[in-house]
Amino acid sequence: MKQLWCAMSLMAGSLLFSVNASADTSSGALLQQMNLASQSLNYELSFVSISKQGVESLRYRHARLNNQPLAQLLQLDGPRREVVLRGTEISYFEPGLDPFTLNGDYIVDSLPSLVYSDFKRLSAAYDFISVGRTRIADRLCDVIRVVARDGTRYSFIAWLDAETKLPLRVDLLDRDGETLEQFRVVSFNVGDNVSASMETLAKANLPPQLSVPEGGDKANFNWAPTWLPQGVTEVSSSQRRLPTFDGPVESRLYSDGLFSFSININRATAASSDQLLRT
């Protein structure tokens, strides 16, 4: 769980592409099939997650048992770190910390946010561009770019298994086309044998639910940004106090369904100096 705090955070963009409507429609349909396959099939993925912080080796298993989702994300190297999804409960297990449970629909840790996006919503601000086929993990894949039309956000490239539509690789790119993060499958398995291997998790006792504090006092602010990127809407607003600030901080959280950012305002005083906090 990460809280985004910034004075203003703008999302960098990428190259723009011109494509015809039929190409966008078919690519969008493939992405929607990826979303459905990721949440309905019984499968196991061994993958690496690469970012500026380093490389992680992980295994993700997903199944549907008794008409509810069951998933496990396991770190394969170093200390055992595990995340378990059962129904709408997500439990975290990590050495040195008490295990706890939160409410949620799917595991997002180390998995690309693109997989669970609402592509019908994203189609209002993004182009979905087919760039051909290639092989990943010895599987033929459809390759699709996801690019914001106004050039204000990062872009994605997704490699979808041509048969199952599961994501086998997803790259997050900056505006210069440099890879910031990469999710890359090295082996995977699809079938009922995956659900059979997870039956013990379905019966396991999960840790207690963590009490999550309220997001702050609800408030109607007398300020608002004069410009927002296309497709971005306000998700929530709150007011709270932070140790490093005098007086309350007013916060608005925005999202386009794929990327999120917040704008936080604190009333200036005579001793205040200009500062920009960026996340």
Where do the PLM segments sit?
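Bacterial N-terminal signal peptides that target proteins for export
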Residues: 1-8
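Cleavable N-terminal signal peptides
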Residues: 10-11, 21
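N-terminal mature ectodomain segment of secretory-pathway/periplasmic proteins
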Residues: 23-96, 126-134, 140-155, 162, ...
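Acidic/charged, solvent-exposed loop-and-adjacent secondary-structure segments enriched in E/D, K/R, S/T
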Residues: 92-114
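Signal peptide-directed extracytoplasmic domains
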Residues: 109-110, 118, 123
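Gly/Pro-enriched, hydrophobic low-complexity segments
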Residues: 137-206
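Short, solvent-exposed recognition patches
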Residues: 206-279
